[in-house]
Design a protein with these regions (language model features):
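Hydrophobic beta-strand signal
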Residues: 47-48, 62
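Aromatic- and Lys/Arg-enriched surface recognition patch
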Residues: 58-118
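Short, charged beta-turn/beta-strand-edge "cap" motif at the junction between a beta-strand
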Residues: 49-55
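Charged phosphate-binding loop/patch that engages nucleotide di/tri-phosphates or the phosphate backbone
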Residues: 117-134
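Compositionally biased, charged N-terminal/linker segments
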Residues: 1-40, 134
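Short, charged, solvent-exposed linker or helix-capping segments at domain edges/interfaces
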Residues: 14, 92-98, 129-131
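Short, acidic Gly/Pro/Ser/Thr-rich loop/turn segments
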Residues: 8-10, 90, 125-127
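Loop/turn positions that initiate beta-strands
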Residues: 43-44
Length: 134
């Protein structure tokens, strides 16, 4: 998985400070992104992507609680998951670097740039880990 957050709203540093308890990944109001949240399982790992400022993958988080009603959504239609910080990448991976890699050209990060929560296939996960020097 890959989850996007604007670093001035929620950054990897704030996620790290949340500790093992983790923090809710809430506020998602796109139906496709919400569907992706519903598909996440406890233990799934997700790349943490800083959007708008930086535009780069900066770390990895882990799902600690599967989807539940997002308390910030008064309609009760959208869900959240809880994630905890696992690690920062040794080398952040910029969107430009990802776009240059032919084997990653199919990613929703490139094809659906407005999507905030998206799946990452295992081959792409390995490539991105290598690019991030993990």
């Amino acid at each position: 998985w890959l989850m996007k957050s604007e670093p001035d709203v929620w950054s990897i540093d704030q996620q790290k400070k949340a500790g093992n308890k983790g923090a809710p990944w809430d506020g998602v109001r796109n139906y496709q992104a919400a569907k992706n949240l519903r598909s996440m399982k406890k233990g799934d790992q997700c790349f943490f992507y800083h959007s708008n400022i930086g535009k780069e993958i900066v770390g990895i988080v882990e799902v600690t609680k599967e989807h539940y009603i997002d308390k910030t959504d008064q309609s009760g239609r959208f869900v959240a998951v809880t994630v905890k910080f696992l690690r920062e990448l040794d080398k952040p991976i910029s969107l430009e670097e990802i776009k240059k890699h032919k084997e990653l050209s199919h990613l929703s990060l490139i094809k659906q740039s407005r999507l905030s929560v998206m799946p990452i296939d295992s081959k792409s996960w390995k490539i991105l880990n290598k690019m991030g020097k993990i």
